[in-house]
Regions:
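Basic, Lys/Arg-enriched alpha-helical interface segments
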Residues: 1-57, 65-70, 76, 81-84
């Protein structure tokens, strides 16, 4: 059962600001979430219910919507700024 991947508009804007080589790595990792959406760690606190995957110094915060078989990338950013 393969999931589809969606990227929130604000996350896409943040991705556009990242260096091209890092963009490609981030896109590859997001693509891999189609096959294994629970690959990332579970977040707590303010980000409860969301998951996180690390890509070098960047983080992708995403939500798995099991009913719709969708992985939604909510935030993409540098590790120092993604949680702000």
């Amino acid at each position: 059962m393969a999931y589809s991947v969606s990227i929130k508009q604000s996350a896409a804007k943040a991705l556009a600001k990242v260096a091209h080589e890092d963009q490609l790595r981030i896109i590859d990792v997001i693509d891999e979430l189609k096959a294994n959406p629970t690959a990332g760690g579970v977040l707590k606190g303010e980000f409860s219910g969301l998951r996180l995957i690390r890509v070098g110094n960047y983080r992708v915060v995403y939500e798995v919507q099991d009913q719709k078989l969708v992985v939604l990338a909510v935030r993409i950013g540098h590790r120092r700024e993604v949680y702000r």
